[in-house]
């Protein structure tokens, strides 16, 4: 049976697949449109299953403000090339819109967009993963995206410009907590034990070692907290001092970076070439 251009166009419009894939699917089903769609969906699911084991550590961070809250979303792919692809970004923004509409939980988002994800994997040829969604509440919010890879939202009592600058600082300096006193007790205890051991190994007298540990702990909690860090725009001041001058306060923040915490496969190009040469000699 001859397949018409109109049939190919209809299948392409309905599936988003490539023209040649659509033509082939229609030829295999003798022009049966619905069967062609079913077969393409099955094929796409199989391709997605094969890609599921591939490490997806690239991608994008998106942010959208709602009423009294903001949502940050991370969607991953395997390469920076696909991270800029219009189809990938369209998918990610669709997920973001649904998340922002009603604070949808991550697992529910994954389930809702699984069919679209599978179709996208089949079309693009890379593993795609809706990895994280975070919500932050606040009457006053400021957001900042550094390129496509880092997203920050800060909430607090301050003017828009001040909160925006603090969001930029968070993007650059990666604080883990708002204030030094917010550092959890178990984190403090673990670091304190380490510093005591270091001081003892240095052979310091007990009274001096104790003072050294106090100083080091103050530095430690300051470096991992927002208000204790040196402010990137005025390094002689801490963020806390800058906020005090402005009569401002930060109550919370969220920072997401693409791929953080994902163990990536290290590519050794020289070893790969050597292996290929060795294999060719055996052939």
From Swiss-Prot:
MF (Gene Ontology): translation elongation factor activity
Cited Pfam families: EF_TS (PF00889)
GO cellular component: cytoplasm
Entry keyword annotation includes Glycoprotein: no
Domain of life of the source: Bacteria
Cell location: Cytoplasm
Gene3D superfamilies with a match to the protein in the record: 1.10.286.20, DNA helicase RuvA subunit, C-terminal domain, Elongation factor Ts, dimerisation domain
UniProt cross-references to InterPro entries, sorted A to Z: EF-Ts_dimer_sf, Transl_elong_EFTs/EF1B, Transl_elong_EFTs/EF1B_dimer, Transl_elong_Ts_CS, UBA-like_sf
CDD domains named among the record's database cross-references: UBA_EF-Ts
UniProt keyword terms in alphabetical order: Cytoplasm, Elongation factor, Protein biosynthesis
Region Involved in Mg(2+) ion dislocation from EF-Tu, annotated ranges: 79-82
NCBIfam families, sorted: tsf
Annotated family: Belongs to the EF-Ts family.
Matching PANTHER family: ELONGATION FACTOR TS (PTHR11741), ELONGATION FACTOR TS, MITOCHONDRIAL (PTHR11741:SF0)
Function (record text): Associates with the EF-Tu.GDP complex and induces the exchange of GDP to GTP. It remains bound to the aminoacyl-tRNA.EF-Tu.GTP complex up to the GTP hydrolysis stage on the ribosome.
HAMAP family, alphabetized: EF_Ts (MF_00050)
Protein name: Elongation factor Ts
Gene source species: Shewanella sp. (strain W3-18-1)
The gene coding this protein: tsf
């Amino acid at each position: 049976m001859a397949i018409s251009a109109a049939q190919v166009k209809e299948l392409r419009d309905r599936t988003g697949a490539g023209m040649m894939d659509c033509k082939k699917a229609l030829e295999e089903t003798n022009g049966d449109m619905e069967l062609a769609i079913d077969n393409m969906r099955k094929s796409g699911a199989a391709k997605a299953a094969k890609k599921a084991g591939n490490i997806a550590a690239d991608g994008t961070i998106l942010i959208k403000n709602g009423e009294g809250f903001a949502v940050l979303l991370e969607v991953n792919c395997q390469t920076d090339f696909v991270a800029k692809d219009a189809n990938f970004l369209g998918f990610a923004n669709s997920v973001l819109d649904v998340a922002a509409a009603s604070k949808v939980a991550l697992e529910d988002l994954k389930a809702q967009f699984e069919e679209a994800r599978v179709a996208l994997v089949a079309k693009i040829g890379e593993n795609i993963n809706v990895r994280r969604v975070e919500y932050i509440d606040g009457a006053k919010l400021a957001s900042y995206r550094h390129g496509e890879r880092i997203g920050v939202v800060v909430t607090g009592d301050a003017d828009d410009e001040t909160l925006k600058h603090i969001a930029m600082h968070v993007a650059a300096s990666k604080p883990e907590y708002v204030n030094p006193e917010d550092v959890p007790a178990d984190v403090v205890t673990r670091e304190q034990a380490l510093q005591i051991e270091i001081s003892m190994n240095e052979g310091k007298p007990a009274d001096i070692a104790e003072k050294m540990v106090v100083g080091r702990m103050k530095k430690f909690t300051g470096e991992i907290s927002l208000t204790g860090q040196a402010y990137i725009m005025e390094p002689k001041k801490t963020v806390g001092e800058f906020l005090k001058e402005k009569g401002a306060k930060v109550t919370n923040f969220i920072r997401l970076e693409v791929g953080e915490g994902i163990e990536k496969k290290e590519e050794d190009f020289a070893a790969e070439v050597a292996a290929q040469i060795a294999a060719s000699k055996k052939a």
